[in-house]
Amino acid sequence: MDKNELPPDVALMWRLRETPRRGPKPSLSLDDIVRAAIEIADADNDLGAVSMARVAERLGNSTMALYRHVKSKDDLLVLMSDAAIERPDPMPEGVDWRTGLTFWADNVLAAIRKHRWYAKIPISGPPAGPNNLAWFDAALGVLNGTGLPEEAKVGVVMGLITYVQGEVRMAFDLAAGYDENPAAFQQFGATLRQVADPRQYPAVARLVEAGVFDEVGSFEDESEADFDFGLQLYLDGVAAFIDRVSPAG
């Protein structure tokens, strides 16, 4: 494939189709536009707050000036999705695959927490921008010593991405729900006692009887604990998979 045949969004993220211009260097760059859009989304904690008009206003330029660099808001969101995640921290030297993937997942979580709106960006394709590809490469590299086939490494990493993204999105949604109606969470155990007939919902009734929902601690602490629990559970499965299929397991 020639570079001119690359998908438009890929070419955009890699800056492969910027129009050369004669004369003085323009006062506005594509990086300026993306940075301003990220700042707006961060300030409002809302991806929907980003518009070409608001970005132009923030930069002190006309909306038409932005369109010389980026054709649409959709293109701008593509650029934001790669720029906001930045590059991953270097992997510590000499770590085993499990420690490495734990480090990687924790860093993905930290990166998304810096830009909570990031969790709302639709995932419509494989990682193709320079920053997202760097994260993908880092996770794949951790699996090098496992003896897994290359295709299996991709499966492990994609499963981990699915877990992290799903857990983050659910945690953010639940946190928003808690802020709106904390009583629904605090009274959940009492509510279940009233509606969950043990004959119809025996497993739920056992949870209620055990007092699992009686105490509601810090929502953020519980979310962190849930993330770590699910992550290690997933990695337990990866360990069993490596032992089963890899000579180096």
Go through the PLM ranges and name each one:
Residues 1-28, 202-211, 246-249:
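N-terminal intrinsically disordered/low-complexity leader segments
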Residues 32-39, 75-90, 103-107, 134, ...:
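Alpha-helical structural segments
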Residues 32, 36, 40-75:
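Helix-turn-helix
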Residues 162-176, 194-219, 236-244:
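Amphipathic C-terminal alpha-helical segment
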